[in-house]
Amino acid sequence: MKILVDENMPYARELFSRLGDVQAVPGRPVPAEALTDADALMVRSVTRVNEALLSGKAVKFVGTATAGTDHVDQAWLQQAGIGFSAAPGCNAIAVVEYVFSSLLMLAERDGFALRDRTVGIVGVGNVGGRLQKRLEALGIKTLLCDPPRAERGDEGDFRSLDALVQEADVLTFHTPLYKEGPYKTQHLADESLISRLKPGTILINACRGPVVDNAALLKRLEAGQPLSVVLDVWEPEPDLNVELLKRVDIGTAHIAGYTLEGKARGTTQVFEAYSAFIGHPQQVALDTLLPAPEFGRITLHGPLDQPTLKRLVHLVYDVRRDDAPLRKVAGVAGEFDKLRKNYQERREWSSLYVQCSDAQAATLLRQLGFNAVHHPVR
């Protein structure tokens, strides 16, 4: 049994070798010759999986180690009798922590308290739901927009997108990419919406590039109308608009979900799905794969305020480390993908063990995802 895995899927060789012969290949593009006799293909979001890629091939199963699936033609796979699995929620924590790192950087730079801001979350699924909980743990007001969930009658106070535009100080997008249909999200933030954003609004897109009309966004920024913009995803990729990058506050190479934990979850989820598909189900404990974190433990004295939280967050991950490299190579062919391929290891907040002298600080840090304990000073 021959299994092709994206060369940038951590632990893929180690896990899938339990099931067959593993060959690691580039994801953009996947070499055609490697597909000739492959039984299974494991990809990331850079690989377009469709009839053009797999027609006439022996592949019987496709797994994507990503939460999003817009790069996979699932209808064709089903028609062709090819099994499929994704990894929903695998990188949700990573994206939430990317958003927090960005907001805390902007808050420090511009001198505002996050508790004085209202955050509008568009798309309240694996990412948006976790973001809501962490923001509200800090006492930050959130407004939620998720039309599919609202129409299903799901629990939650869902508002219209127009209401968020009018009332929110931060607008952050966490939707799938749907190019058509009743819940179309392509250019959900279109020229009309972007023109109505209040001066000083913080706009964040860490889901899919075409959810925000990049041309319309550049038009507003070129007009000198004040917005703070955080973009991890672009329209198009990998050939992003360099002029837009010059004008955003934070720009990164589609890496918001790129924690080691998030990528490992993606690999283990598709491994477990494929092992079940071939009739040999196996389970993997994530902590048996992950290495020890760079920082073993730290001690926090006193209560948790915003500057202290910012230092803790940026100790684990400072978004500026990914902004600068993209600006250096923007516009150079192939460099966007190189940044993703050679991405520096990044961990989640749970990897940081924090001993807190203050019990409330320990409780709050745990709610935010840190590995925190109350350890009174004696």
Curated annotation (Swiss-Prot):
Chain sites annotated for binding NAD(+): D146, T175, D232, G257
UniProt keyword Cytoplasm, yes or no: yes
Highest taxon, organism lineage: Bacteria
Keywords tagged on the record: Cytoplasm, NAD, Oxidoreductase, Pyridoxine biosynthesis
Cysteines paired by S-S bonds: none
Family matches, as PROSITE patterns: D_2_HYDROXYACID_DH_1, D_2_HYDROXYACID_DH_3
Its biological purpose: Catalyzes the oxidation of erythronate-4-phosphate to 3-hydroxy-2-oxo-4-phosphonooxybutanoate.
Complex formation: Homodimer.
Protein family membership: Belongs to the D-isomer specific 2-hydroxyacid dehydrogenase family. PdxB subfamily.
Full protein name: Erythronate-4-phosphate dehydrogenase
Lineage: Bacteria, Pseudomonadati, Pseudomonadota, Gammaproteobacteria, Enterobacterales
